[in-house]
Regions:
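S-adenosylmethionine
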Residues: 1-443
Length: 443
């Protein structure tokens, strides 16, 4: 398939809308992550902060509501053959029904952008949007009852069915929660500054603290990126959920530690800044990701930090026995849908099965390389029970010398404990990623 050319326009409104169309096209057809693609465009173009906010809002609104938006477009038009026209209809439909927009203005702008894409499609675009606007209630009533939840909330039907099995009492709340907005969170290095000093700096840059967990703060804006403490690495992007996985590793001075699926390195850095291991070995299976770990090592200069190219399912290749192992598993990523909403459309039920097998292989390899008395923290950024509770149950049954340990979770973090002692960072936490954490000791 020939890749579509990027669109360019002459008018300011046209330029922004065309950039939005190109970003969405990259996400849906070139399989780029939304947050990465947005940052890429923002680094290349001189947008104002207001424009960045608008672009981010439109892109996320389209992606998070894609199934429902496409349903409305399919009901309101004949088959849309032009890919960029389809993206334009998606953007405009999102504005009409999910954003505080002037309907007439949205349709007028769509016509102006259509002129740049293909002037022969202007009439089609205008007519399609007017039909959708006029007939939305009728189209809503035509959604089959057994598919309503999946279409309206934009979840694949197989996943809706799975959630009903895993969480029969609150699956709808979970679905709704992970369609909400995400928040910027950062962690400051407590070795470089106090909490009071960091909070004082936030006030100086007109940034409000929305929520915090220890050294992780959720912020009202991105002003922190312009500060020296961010540029020099004393403050890094990290979610409190992943921080808690590291915190529960509870490394003692002089211990040998493995971060088995380490890239891009945020958890490895947290281990080095929170604890004082004799040695931390961080590995990844992909060369380009190992380069990210090497860059982290070179930037911070920790003498006890080692980086290796290695398959996490073959940890024994390292020929090292570890006191502590962090297994932040490759997973379906359902807990980070607020930040990466596109993941839901790429995932299949077979992917969950494949991931579960891989997670078992990684754990079994880690178990072989864990010292007697050593501990593993198992974590994922998903709420899929097959990848979490069911795996931990399997490990406990297979290895009789394993015991599950209590977790240290701050009082302001709501969790859902499973029957084994593992913890899901609850969907009710407005700011935090969905995560699962379990801690096991080899006796």
């Amino acid at each position: 398939m020939v890749k579509n050319k990027k669109l360019t326009g002459n008018k300011i409104v046209g330029n922004i809308k065309l950039d939005i169309i190109n970003i969405i096209d990259d996400i849906l057809y070139e399989k780029k992550y939304s947050n990465i693609q947005l940052n890429y465009y923002f680094s290349k173009k001189n947008y104002t902060q207001k424009e960045k906010t608008f672009i981010t809002s439109v892109v996320n609104t389209v992606i998070k509501n894609l199934i429902y938006i496409d349903y409305l477009i399919e009901k309101g038009t004949r088959n849309v053959k032009k890919r960029k026209i389809k993206q334009l209809l998606r953007v405009s439909t999102a504005q009409l029904f999910f954003m505080d927009s002037d309907n007439a203005g949205v349709i007028f702008e769509a016509g102006e952008v259509a002129k740049i894409i293909n002037e022969h499609q202007v009439g089609f675009v205008n007519a399609a949007l007017k039909t959708i606007l006029k007939s939305k209630e009728k189209f809503d009533n035509e959604i089959p009852m057994d598919k309503r939840e999946g279409i309206v909330l934009s979840y694949p039907q197989w996943l809706v069915n799975k959630l009903k099995i895993d969480y029969p009492d609150n699956y709808l709340e979970i679905m709704e929660s992970y369609k909400k907005r995400s928040y910027l969170s950062v962690r400051f290095d407590k070795n470089k500054m106090t909490k009071e000093k960091f909070e004082k700096l936030l006030k100086e840059i007109n940034t409000e603290v929305l929520f915090s967990v220890d050294e992780v703060y959720y912020l009202s804006n991105a002003n922190i990126f312009d500060t020296e403490i961010y540029k020099n690495g004393d403050v890094v992007i990290q979610d409190a959920s992943s921080y808690l996985a590291v915190k529960n590793l509870a490394v003692k001075d002089g211990e040998i530690v493995l971060d088995a699926c380490a890239a891009p390195g945020g958890k490895s850095l947290a281990i080095l800044q929170l604890f004082n291991p004799e040695k931390l070995i961080s590995t990844d299976i992909h060369e380009h990701k190992v380069k990210l770990l090497d860059e982290l090592k070179n930037k911070y200069g920790y003498g006890n930090f080692r980086v290796r190219l290695n398959d996490a399912a073959q940890i024994e290749n390292l020929e090292v026995k570890f006191d502590k192992i962090l297994l932040d598993m490759p997973c379906s990523g359902l807990g980070v849908l607020r930040k990466k909403p596109e993941k839901i459309y790429e995932l299949t039920s077979n992917d969950i099965k494949t991931l579960k097998k891989l997670q078992k292989k990684i754990f079994e390899s880690a178990y072989k390389c864990l010292k007697n008395g050593g501990e593993i923290v198992y974590s994922t950024c998903t709420f899929s029970k097959n990848e979490n509770t069911n795996n931990i149950r399997y490990f406990l049954e297979k290895y009789e010398d394993l015991e599950i340990l209590d977790l240290e979770i701050p009082e302001n973090v709501e969790i859902i404990k499973d029957e084994l002692g593992g913890a899901y960072i609850s969907y009710k936490n407005k700011y935090m990623d969905g995560f699962y954490i379990a801690k096991l000791r080899k006796n």
